[in-house]
Amino acid sequence: MIFIRSLLFNIVSFTWTFLLLVLYIPILLLPRASMLAAIRFWIAGILALQRVLLRLDFEFRGTENLPDGPCIIAAAHQSAWDTIAFYAVVDDPAFILKQELYRIPMFETYARRLNMIAIDRTGGAGEARRMIRDVADRLSAMRKVIIFPGGTRSAPEDIVPLKSGISALYRRSNVPVVPVSLNSGYFWGRRSFRKRPGRIVAQFHEPLLPGLDGSDFDRILSARIHDGNRLLLDEAQDA
């Protein structure tokens, strides 16, 4: 039954996505707010299909830890779900995305229209400086920047070393960093066709305020993300 539900979800969600990609082309000419509203409508559809076809619900906890103003959200990354679901709780997120995604047909057009941040992970120090400038630009526009500091999707039980980019952003940005733990990979794993029913939980932890020593920041951020991942995985497995 899980296979059939997963197959049906893939067919319907891909059809929904392709249809809206075509219908949204004229919206590219309108103000960015129109494109943002259109993307939120697409994501609402995906999340509704997830609930109905996969019987997979979701919950955000600790949203009171999100500052009203700009901040950096440093989230675990276990699933494709992570790249869309934050729109449910963040009004206008600016995702930091790997450059390879921009090779997907039409993806680059929409990502640039939404003013996302693309990074070349092989670009070295120059690319890191550009990322810091781009993040500063989005924060100055009162947006929340979302980064996956582990760099790529991982299994929910993995303890992934955090990349140095998040430390550089913390030092240079002077805004709170909000850690996020997930258990999405247990239900909707990377490169996995089957998607389990249940409830995905994303937990926003207490923000790390500016002023921490670099080593303390790295240690606390890693502990909050990975300890939270473990607890949420245990919760999913015990349900």
Predicted regions and their residues:
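Membrane-interfacial terminal anchoring regions of lipid-handling membrane enzymes
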Residues: M1-L28, E64, D137, D216-A239
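Catalytic core of membrane glycerolipid acyltransferases/transacylases, capturing the structured
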Residues: L21-I39, A44, R51-L53, D68-G124
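Short acidic-hydrophobic, aromatic-tinged amphipathic segments that line or gate anion-handling sites
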Residues: F60, I117-D120, P210
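Non-catalytic C-terminal accessory region of glycerolipid acyltransferases
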Residues: R129-A239
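Short beta-strand-to-loop junctions in surface cap/lid or active-site-entrance loops
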Residues: F60-P67
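Membrane-helix interfacial anchor on the cytosolic side
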Residues: L54-F60
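Generic preference for hydrophobic
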Residues: F60, I73, F95-I96, A202-F204
